[in-house]
Swiss-Prot record:
This is Transmembrane protein C1orf162. Residues 19-28 have a biased composition (Low complexity). One of its GO terms (cellular component) is membrane. It comes from Homo sapiens (Human). Keywords: Membrane, Phosphoprotein, Transmembrane, Transmembrane helix. Residues 1-28, 92-114 are annotated as: Disordered. The modification Phosphoserine is found at S140. The keyword Phosphoprotein applies. InterPro entries: C1orf162. The keyword Membrane applies. The lineage of its organism: Eukaryota, Metazoa, Chordata, Craniata, Vertebrata.
Length: 155
């Protein structure tokens, strides 16, 4: 198959004419660290600004929804909140005073006699064991058992 006669003999004359210089390559354009830092800082600032813009947009949507809901579904405060100006500040509309409801009872007039004073009543209600067990089963542990109701005083 392949005998000794097929071996290659070196040609000394041909080797002398070939040059062994390395091929020249053009330098590849590489980005320096200086440009990478600028791009990173720019991307960070753009991300922060976009996040702030998104938060402002969500805030405006919530604010307009609350305003729309307040105009469409007015919450009527109780008679006590209509006549006590300190408590009416806790309502959603802080700037406008509440107009009295013509269908409600007139406010109690303050006495001009200095001897009379305001009296307060404190009441506690005791539930029977049967009802308290029923309430404990149906409600969670943080249930507030205090019930508030309007009390009308007549002379």
């Amino acid at each position: 198959m392949g005998g000794n006669g097929s071996t290659c003999k070196p040609d000394t004359e041909r080797q002398g004419t070939l040059s062994t210089a390395a091929p020249t390559t053009s330098p590849a354009p590489c980005l320096s660290n200086h440009h990478n830092k600028k791009h990173l800082i720019l991307a960070f600032c753009a991300g922060v600004l976009l996040t702030l813009l998104l938060i402002a947009f969500i805030f405006l949507i919530i604010k307009s929804y609350r305003k729309y809901r307040r105009e469409r579904l007015p919450i009527s405060p109780g008679p006590l909140l209509r006549w006590v100006p300190l408590l009416s500040g806790t309502m959603a509309d802080h700037s406008k005073p509440q107009a009295p409801d013509p269908h409600s009872d007139p406010p109690a007039k303050l006495s001009s006699i200095p001897g009379e004073s305001l009296t307060y009543a404190s009441t506690t209600f005791k539930l029977s064991e049967e009802k308290s067990n029923h309430l404990a089963e149906n409600h969670s542990a943080d249930f507030d058992p205090i019930v508030y109701a309007q009390i009308k005083v007549t002379n």
